[in-house]
Swiss-Prot record:
GO cellular component: endoplasmic reticulum membrane; intracellular membrane-bounded organelle
UniProt EC number: 1.14.14.26, 1.14.14.29
Principal subcellular localization: endoplasmic reticulum
Subcellular location: Endoplasmic reticulum membrane; Microsome membrane
Residues reported to bind heme: 447
Protein name: Cytochrome P450 7B1
Source taxon at top rank: Eukaryota
Cofactors (names): heme
Molecular function per GO: 24S-hydroxycholesterol 7-alpha-hydroxylase activity; 25-hydroxycholesterol 7-alpha-hydroxylase activity; heme binding; iron ion binding
A Pfam family hit: p450
């Protein structure tokens, strides 16, 4: 995109992150004692490793699927692993997930997420104010239903404006890295849709600097959510504070055309904070990060797989063309096509493609913190858990299970289509799975912005496939960078370039 700075998918590698974590352990002399824990009666099998603090982290981050499958064969579906200073009990049987997600009193997501927000975004009040927590989560309802329809209408207008002012003017082949292109595109559309327009005379410079600072912050994010003391993360803390200053209550109020959810968040935060409290900006940073951090890499992977699979691109373009013809819409110079949420949902091939992309690249985990010593009943077995430990469900094992998905490593755009409709029936061990793709979490931790994110991906893919010629340049296969393990959509482990130009329309 014009005006976009170079953005690579070069997130900190797992070994670099673990190296810094290991250095931090030198400051904590008692950490070695943590590895001396022994298994008590009725507790799950315990896998500690020999490295102080790190435990089994090196093997886990190198190849998490193989690591967990190996332990599953050795110890069964439930076991505890010592990882980076934490004891995490994995429950790998998908038919037992409900026993973890439906016990919020003893297995809490809220306290875990509040601590994460305190360190990653400097939102401290959520740790102690349950009323604020409830009000913040209640506001997320404005990302569903009719408010979501209004957001989609705004998004369409923002896409139209951005494409017509910049991208449609590119009539000769232009080469960019896919991740950089997707990052700039998703950032600008998302920010304008949610926060409105910056009215200052130097608005292009302001949004460009905010975008670049956000990308730097996001690259640092795995460090921020680690156990490394914030005092050792001076660059990360400095970037965090810089963005917070750009999103103060006063500066957000000066933006024109804010979405209803941003207005609601502004109003409710004023009830809990002074008008000039910097923590209001910290809340906005957390909300902005949640709106972008997984959509950008998901959009990258969607473009990457579609460009590498001509049959997918052809099927998607055929579906879009058929829809436009059925609704009397015509393609031509300028953005003239329009979609409602119901119409986007009706595009079965597009829905299947996005689900397949999320299945392949999502490594999110459902995490709960044990609030008290307890017994976790899993059908015929019961395990003792200790206060302060964590319980994790790991959906990538389902996503990559050959019993559930034939050839799970392959990209198949039509995997979720059956007889021209969405396929929703998948089995394991002869039993139907209630949920078979879980990129957005489960239960109380399910991403509230999932519909917004998927609709944005659908809309952008439609516009790119309709109005542009697209070709991949780097045809080498790439893999996943696992430095964001547990955090959602993984980044690629290397850069990939493509070229594009606006289609020429004959009158």
């Amino acid at each position: 995109m014009q005006g976009a700075t170079t953005l690579d998918a070069a997130s900190p590698g797992p070994l670099a992150l673990l190296g810094l974590l290991f250095a931090a352990t030198l400051l904590l002399s008692a950490l070695f004692l943590l590895t001396r824990r022994t298994r008590r009666p009725r507790e799950p099998p315990l896998i500690k490793g020999w490295l102080p603090y790190l435990g089994m982290a090196l093997k886990f981050f190198k190849d998490p699927l193989t690591f967990l499958k190996t332990l599953q064969r050795q110890h069964g579906d439930t076991f505890t692993v010592f990882l980076v200073g934490k004891y995490i009990t994995f429950v790998l049987n998908p038919f037992q997930y409900q026993y973890v997600t439906k016990n919020p009193k003893q297995l809490s997501f809220q306290k875990f997420s509040s601590r994460l927000s305190a360190k990653a975004f400097s939102v401290k009040k959520l740790l102690t104010d349950d009323d604020l927590n409830e009000d913040v989560h209640r506001a997320y309802l404005l990302l569903q239903g009719k408010p979501l329809d209004a957001l989609l209408e705004t998004m369409i207008q923002e896409v139209k404006e951005l494409f017509e002012s910049q991208l449609l003017k590119i009539t000769d082949w232009n080469t960019e890295r896919i991740f950089a292109f997707c990052g700039s595109l998703v950032f600008e559309i998302t920010f304008a849709t949610l926060y409105g327009k910056i009215l200052a005379g130097n608005k292009k410079q302001i949004i460009s600097e905010l975008r670049d600072d956000f990308f730097k912050f996001d690259d640092m994010f795995p460090y921020l959510v680690s156990d490394i003391p914030i005092q050792l993360l001076r660059n990360e803390e400095s970037m965090q504070k810089k963005i917070i200053k750009c999103l103060t209550s006063e500066k957000v109020a000066q933006m024109q055309g804010q979405s209803k959810i941003v207005q609601e968040r502004q109003d409710l935060l004023k009830r809990y904070y002074r008008h000039d409290d910097p923590e209001i900006g910290a809340h906005h940073l957390g909300f902005l990060w949640a709106s972008l951090a997984n959509t950008i890499p998901a959009m990258f992977w969607a473009m990457y797989y579609i460009l590498r699979h001509p049959e997918a691109m052809e099927a998607l373009r055929d579906e879009i063309d058929s829809f436009l013809q059925s609704t009397g819409q015509k393609k031509g110079p300028g953005i003239s096509v329009h979609f409602t949420r119901e119409q986007l949902d009706s595009l079965v091939c597009l829905e299947s493609t996005i689900l397949e992309v999320l299945r392949l690249c999502s490594y999110s985990s459902i995490i709960r913190e044990v609030q008290e010593d307890m017994n976790l009943s899993l059908e015929s077995k019961s395990f003792s858990l200790r206060k302060g430990d964590f319980v994790a469900l790991f959906p990538p094992l389902i996503h990559n299970d050959p019993e559930i998905f034939d050839a799970p490593k392959e990209f198949r755009f039509d995997r979720f289509i059956e007889d021209g409709k969405k396929k929703s029936t998948f089995f394991k061990g002869g039993k139907k799975l209630k949920t078979y793709v879980m990129p957005f979490g489960l239960g109380t931790s399910k991403c509230p912005g999932r519909y917004f994110a998927v609709n944005e991906m659908k809309l952008l893919l439609i516009m790119l496939l309709t109005y542009f010629d697209l070709e991949i340049i780097d045809r080498k296969p790439i893999g996943l960078n696992h430095s964001r393990m547990f955090l959602g959509i993984q980044h690629p482990d290397s850069a990939v370039s493509f070229r594009y130009k606006a289609k020429s329309w004959r009158s």
